[in-house]
Amino acid sequence: MSKVLVEAKGMGLRSTPYKLNLVADLIRGKPVSVAVMYLKFCKKKSARYISKVLKSAIANAQANYSVDVDNLYIKEVLVGKSFSLRRIHARARGKACRVYKHYGNVIIKLFERV
């Protein structure tokens, strides 16, 4: 196994960490070509965000280390919590409730298997 480890980050993605993690579970440990196909046909909105980060990681690997895409595998997909926007939701009798709009972070690490 080679020591080439490529990383790409997607910060402040407009999806909750739970929803991002549902899609991230599909591609953990898979070859990059298979993972791209999984994300292409996944109907979830978070799949688009993770797909963009994965394509960025692939581009980083090709540009910085000139590795072959067929040898790249996903080592880990880290999903975390980012900031939360607080909004006001008007309720009955002049009351108001807070609504939290949660955002998430995704970090994808790739390695080259020879």
Swiss-Prot record:
Pfam families: Ribosomal_L22. GO terms for cellular component: cytosolic large ribosomal subunit. Keywords: Ribonucleoprotein, Ribosomal protein, RNA-binding, rRNA-binding. InterPro entries: Ribosomal_uL22, Ribosomal_uL22_bac/chlpt-type, Ribosomal_uL22_bac/org-type, Ribosomal_uL22_CS, Ribosomal_uL22_sf. GO terms for biological process: translation. SUPFAM superfamilies: Ribosomal protein L22. It comes from the Bacteria. This protein binds specifically to 23S rRNA; its binding is stimulated by other ribosomal proteins, e.g. L4, L17, and L20. It is important during the early stages of 50S assembly. It makes multiple contacts with different domains of the 23S rRNA in the assembled 50S subunit and ribosome. The globular domain of the protein is located near the polypeptide exit tunnel on the outside of the subunit, while an extended beta-hairpin is found that lines the wall of the exit tunnel in the center of the 70S ribosome. The gene is rplV. GO terms for molecular function: rRNA binding; structural constituent of ribosome. Part of the 50S ribosomal subunit. This is Large ribosomal subunit protein uL22. PROSITE patterns: RIBOSOMAL_L22. Belongs to the universal ribosomal protein uL22 family.
